[in-house]
Amino acid sequence: MKTPKELALLAARALSDKKGKEIQALEIADLTTLADYFVLATGSSNTQINALVDNVEKVLHEEAGEEPLHREGYRGGTWVLLDYGCIAVHVF
C-alpha cells in the first residue's frame, strides 16, 4: 500500500507523462481534513484534460491498485476532480 505522498507523486508523474502543465503536489494535511495532498495541473484543451485524468486513473490503478472514490466534471472537460480520499487531483 502506497503512502499519500507516494500516490501524489504517482499522480504528478502520470500528469507529466501526458504533457500536463503547471503540475503541483501540495501537502495540505495540516490545513484540512479533506485530503493529505492536492495535485494540480492544467491542460490546453478539453481533450487533453480528459487524457490527463484518464492517465492518472490508469497509473494509480496499475501501480497502486487505487480507484477514485469520486470523479467530478469529466463530461464537461473544463475542470475534473478525482478524489482518492488521501489525495485529490484537480485538472483545469
Cite the ranges covered by each PLM segment.
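Polybasic/polar functional segments that serve as interface/processing modules
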Residues: M1-L34, G43-V80
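C-terminal structural segments of small proteins and small subunits
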Residues: L81, H90-F92
